[in-house]
């Protein structure tokens, strides 16, 4: 009983009244409050502005491209870039290109847009002396598609009122052929060739053409065997079997 009533010294101290501690109880983590941060971290903590910040005016500048003056020239017949690279061979190798050389335009005869188109043969004969070698070469390349008209002569161009169907005259009737150019119409007067062999449907198309008629084949007649010959052949076979059965076979 005495053992139960007795208490240890540590338990008596815990059960006794606690004396008020003179110091404030500290936190376990000892975290710093917000008011103490400026004194502890003076370098990191931003300082209060002593005076109001002076605002600087913002100036907006507009970027404008420099205007390049290009002389107004009527539409040239060829690109100035092509002529620039062609004339590059005659220039000295040490010369550097400038802006004036890049935008330099060569004198090219311009074609008026509102003037009527004259005859190509008359125009080529009158301007052969004026055109240089390159213009003459380019004009030949452009007029290459008109070589068929040149071979026909002036007969097709002498009658501008008549039309030409360019090889499709077979689709026209007899009345419409009267207004076609006579150069092309002369070829149409030929009589069309008629096939000597009459037309017949192709009978060799599988699945489309009707099936061909089957031809009946005659069966070959086999020679008949007489009953007497069969009896003789059966009797000979039976005699051979009987002789084989009567043979004495000795097995040691």
Curated annotation (Swiss-Prot):
* Region feature (Disordered): 1-48, 72-142, 199-222
* Motif interval(s): KEN box: 88-90
> Where is motif FGF motif found?
166-168
Biased region (Low complexity) positions are 105-116
Query: Region C-terminal Sororin domain: which residues?
Result: 230-252
In this chain, composition skew of type Basic and acidic residues spans 86-104, 124-140
Family matches, as InterPro entries? Sororin (IPR018605)
Residues recorded with modification Phosphothreonine: 98, 111, 115, 159
Which positions does the record annotate as the modified residue Phosphoserine?
21, 33, 35, 75, 79, 83, 107, 154, 209
Listed under GO biological process in this entry are: cell division; double-strand break repair; mitotic metaphase chromosome alignment; mitotic sister chromatid cohesion; positive regulation of exit from mitosis
GO MF terms listed in the record are:
chromatin binding; protein-containing complex binding
Pfam families this protein is in? Sororin_C, Sororin_middle
Q: Single GO cellular component annotation?
A: chromosome
Task: List where in the cell it is found.
Answer: Nucleus; Chromosome; Cytoplasm
What kind of modification does the protein receive after translation?
Answer: Phosphorylated. Phosphorylation, as cells enter mitosis, disrupts the interaction with PDS5A and relieves the inhibition of WAPL by CDCA5.
Q: Does the keyword RNA-binding apply?
A: no
Name the UniProt key words of this record, in alphabetical order: Cell cycle, Cell division, Chromosome, Cytoplasm, Mitosis, Nucleus, Phosphoprotein, Ubl conjugation
What additional remark is attached to this entry? Answer: Named sororin after the Latin word 'soror', which means 'sister', because of its critical role in sister chromatid cohesion.
Cite the domain annotation text: The KEN box is required for the association with the APC/C complex.
Quaternary organization: Interacts with the APC/C complex. Interacts with the chromatin-bound cohesin complex; the interaction is indirect, occurs after DNA replication and requires acetylation of the cohesin component SMC3. Interacts (via the FGF motif) with PDS5A and PDS5B; the interaction is direct and prevents the interaction of PDS5A with WAPL.
- What is the annotated role of this protein in its UniProt record? Regulator of sister chromatid cohesion in mitosis stabilizing cohesin complex association with chromatin. May antagonize the action of WAPL which stimulates cohesin dissociation from chromatin. Cohesion ensures that chromosome partitioning is accurate in both meiotic and mitotic cells and plays an important role in DNA repair. Required for efficient DNA double-stranded break repair.
Q: Which family does it belong to?
A: Belongs to the sororin family.
Protein name, per record: Sororin
Gene name linked to the record: CDCA5
